[in-house]
From Swiss-Prot:
Assembly information from the UniProt record: Part of a trimeric complex composed of BGLF3, BFRF2 and BVLF1.
Family the UniProt entry places it in: Belongs to the herpesviridae UL95 family.
Lineage: Viruses, Duplodnaviria, Heunggongvirae, Peploviricota, Herviviricetes
Protein name in UniProt: Late gene expression regulator BGLF3
Keyword Phosphoprotein: yes
Known outcome of mutating residue 42 to A: Drastic decrease of expression of vPIC-dependent late genes and loss of production of new virus particles. No effect on early gene expression, viral DNA replication, or expression of vPIC-independent late genes
Post-translational modification: Phosphorylation on threonine is necessary for the formation of the trimeric complex, for the expression of vPIC-dependent late genes and production of new virus particles.
Record InterPro entries: Herpes_UL95
């Protein structure tokens, strides 16, 4: 056989030795399994190892069956003795042989799903609304839509203004973090982060009202008399007391709302990624999209769901740039 390596690269002993080893291995494979591998010398000074992916499997009983000489009943397996395990009486009847047994019918258990992460997506407009203390534009849009009678079907809040004021400007509408990033940057604690549906009443007024009532319920359920609160609403306090009575009419559904601002959540998300700390599943994982993607940095955090084994990646952001841009849209 012609040695192509020696002809092309005679001064490379390492390549020549590797060539010889590969060729020797190919010859051994062809000799051991001639029906699966064939070594072909090409006119281009090289060798081609051809493999048959589906080799012929000729077994004696296959030939006998194909020719019709031996039937399946001719094979005698009476000498085989396999020990059988006792039947589990706790299995459901339909799972037991013959349908006999005293067990009651059981439903197959559903696979347990992990809690996972709660993702919240914010574009540039939503991020500006979430960071701004002035929510008059959102309240004005909601009141304009609610001025029409067709939007008041089976709704609990007969007077929506106290509900919106309590959520956006109430005594429990500011961040409760010990070291608030918003307070360090702007001199006062930031507004708590709310579901995105609360910031866009024009998109779906029913979703806005549903989240509005649930958030107010979670924040102010224990407040019975608003006259004792140190507040100054732009309307009579009796409207807030009426709202407190209507809170008891809402269904007691579990609803969790974290009294944390957007900057503190982003800061916590950055720290989790930097120090590989476990992610708190009660805090949402924030994803900034649209024009807000420019705040994203190269560092990426990861979260592994223990029950499912899946790994989730989440981004980190430049808080300095976000705070610097807040000057243009956050009212003093």
């Amino acid at each position: 056989m012609f040695n192509a390596v020696k002809a092309d690269m005679p001064d490379d002993p390492m390549l020549a030795r590797r060539y010889g080893q590969c060729l020797e291995l190919a010859l051994e494979a062809c000799q051991d399994t001639p029906e699966q591998f064939k070594l072909v010398e090409t006119p281009l000074k090289s060798f081609l190892l051809v493999s048959n992916i589906l080799p012929q499997d000729n077994r004696p009983w296959h030939e006998a069956r194909s020719s019709g000489r031996v039937a399946e009943d001719d094979y005698d397996f009476s000498s085989l003795a396999l020990e059988l395990l006792p039947l589990n009486p706790r299995l459901p009847e339909e799972w037991q042989f013959g349908g006999q047994g005293w067990s009651s019918r059981m439903e197959p258990s559903q696979p347990e799903m992990g809690m996972g992460l709660c993702f919240e997506v914010f574009d540039g407009d939503l991020m500006r609304i979430a960071l701004a203390w002035n929510k008059d534009e959102v309240i004005g849009q909601a009141l304009q839509i609610l001025a029409h009678s067709q939007t008041w079907t089976s709704l609990v809040p007969e007077d929506p203004l106290p509900w919106m004021w309590a959520l956006f400007y109430g005594p429990r509408s500011h961040c409760e973090e010990r070291h608030c990033v918003y307070a360090a940057a702007r001199g006062k604690r930031g507004p708590i982060l709310l579901p995105t549906a609360v910031y866009t009443p024009c998109a779906n007024i029913e979703a806005f009202l549903a989240h509005l009532t649930r958030c107010v319920y979670a924040l102010y359920l224990d407040v019975r008399d608003w006259k004792g609160e140190d507040i100054a609403p732009p309307f009579d306090v009796s409207r807030l007391n009426k709202m407190a009575k209507q809170l008891c009419l809402l269904p007691q559904e579990p609803f969790c709302i974290t009294r944390v601002c957007l900057l503190c959540l982003l800061h916590k998300q950055n720290l989790n990624a930097q120090y590989k700390r476990p992610v708190d599943t009660y805090d949402p994982c924030l994803i900034l999209t649209g024009e807000a993607e420019r705040y994203m940095v190269d560092a990426v955090g990861n979260y592994r769901e223990a029950s499912t084994g899946t790994t989730v990646l989440y981004p980190t952001y430049d808080l300095g740039s976000i705070v610097a841009d807040m000057v243009t849209y956050e009212d003093e």
